[in-house]
Amino acid sequence: MKKQIFAVSMAVLLATGVAFAAIQQGQVMYKQADGTYVVNTTSLTPNVKGFKGATPLEVYIKNNKVVKVEALPNRESPKLFDRVKQVLLPKFNGMKVAKAAKAQAVDGATGATYSSRAVKENVAAAVAYYKKNK
């Protein structure tokens, strides 16, 4: 009996998690419980491309500051895009939204020019979307 209750409980929990993820996945922006806005650029900037294709991001914003920028799966060269993740993405952490809107002014990662340019365009688009829709 306990095993059945546990199995049903786990199934309900899993179904709830999958449903919640599916709802958020289709949205460009959603608000987390702690007040952080998350802007997903997958559908926002489908034509912004790095060297090998789109470079979607999730940009986390709280109190008009970028908390962090996370790269989503893409087709860029892992070795070069790792450089972007290590060098460029952390530069946005703690940056005010007004400054992040001018992301093209941020220095990119050496050797990953196209990827850097695409990431900066994605950040600027995410911040603009946040400012318009928060």
What are these language model-derived features?
Residues 11-13:
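Repetitive helical segments and hydrophobic/amphipathic motifs
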Residues 5-7, 17-117, 121-134:
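Flexible, solvent-exposed loop/hinge segments and secondary-structure transition points
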